[in-house]
């Protein structure tokens, strides 16, 4: 599908960090879903990044981390800071930097916020950003994004048992699509590299917490003269 004649010329763009991509996704989303509060304040933007629903992975970032990422995005001209309010407010410039139409921006936004999606899922989840007539129109824009140089999305191999291929954005860099080839097709989503690192960190945190609690239980049992390893009363 061809872009509109007045689509801006795309600019070269470095790989984004997961937080930078999340910020852009939140700005586009809130521009359409809560236009009365757009451009967004720092507090609203951080809350949108940490939102528990419609996000994969769920993040827990601070205002300072968001501010640092915003500074980097402003340097790339991807975000502008407004000066008409006492409270700094931020808006995206994604369509001009990438040189793509609003339909493609809607699809990229959902991919940045929710992770890999099928074309059908993208049509459903982007409804508040752009109303696609059918799945074919979604696929047409995805194909165009995938054939750009450099490509902005990639079609992932179909997982065993899955009926449709999923798509993933490439704003955070290339992915090894082979990692997704053997993914379980039973409804679980394949994990992106950034998500995998977050999961490993969370696993380590939980393991450390379990070890700390075990040590606490043993110390309390020792103070009470109880054998912490003894089996409990069966009655």
From Swiss-Prot:
Matching InterPro entries, A to Z? DUF480, WH-like_DNA-bd_sf, WH_DNA-bd_sf
* Species this chain originates from: Burkholderia multivorans (strain ATCC 17616 / 249)
Which residue positions does the secretion signal occupy?
Answer: none
Instruction: Give the top-rank taxon of the lineage listed in the UniProt record for this protein.
Output: Bacteria
This protein's name: UPF0502 protein Bmul_3231/BMULJ_05293
Q: Which family does it belong to?
A: Belongs to the UPF0502 family.
Membrane-crossing residue ranges in chain numbering: none
Q: Which Gene3D superfamilies match?
A: Winged helix-like DNA-binding domain superfamily/Winged helix DNA-binding domain
């Amino acid at each position: 599908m061809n872009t509109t004649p007045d689509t801006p010329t795309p600019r070269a763009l470095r790989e984004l960090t997961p937080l930078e991509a999340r910020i852009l996704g939140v700005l586009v989303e809130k521009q359409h879903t809560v236009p009365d509060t757009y451009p967004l304040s720092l507090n609203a933007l951080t809350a949108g990044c940490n939102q528990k629903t419609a996000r994969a992975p769920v993040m827990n970032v601070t205002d300072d981390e968001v501010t640092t990422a915003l500074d980097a995005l402003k340097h790339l001209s991807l975000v502008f800071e407004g000066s008409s309010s006492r409270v700094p407010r931020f808006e995206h410039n994604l369509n001009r930097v990438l040189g793509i139409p609003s339909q493609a921006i809607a699809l990229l936004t959902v991919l940045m916020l929710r992770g890999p999606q099928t074309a059908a899922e993208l049509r459903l989840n982007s409804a508040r950003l752009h109303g696609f007539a059918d799945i074919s129109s979604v696929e047409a824009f995805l194909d165009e994004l995938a054939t750009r140089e450099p490509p902005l999305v990639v079609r992932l191999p179909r997982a065993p048992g899955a009926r449709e291929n999923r798509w993933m954005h490439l704003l955070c860099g290339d992915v090894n699509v082979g990692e997704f080839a053997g993914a379980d097709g039973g409804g679980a989503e394949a994990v992106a590299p950034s998500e995998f690192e977050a999961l490993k960190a969370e696993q380590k945190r939980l393991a450390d917490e379990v070890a700390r609690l075990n040590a606490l239980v043993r110390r309390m049992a020792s103070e009470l003269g109880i054998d912490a390893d003894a089996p409990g009363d069966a009655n």
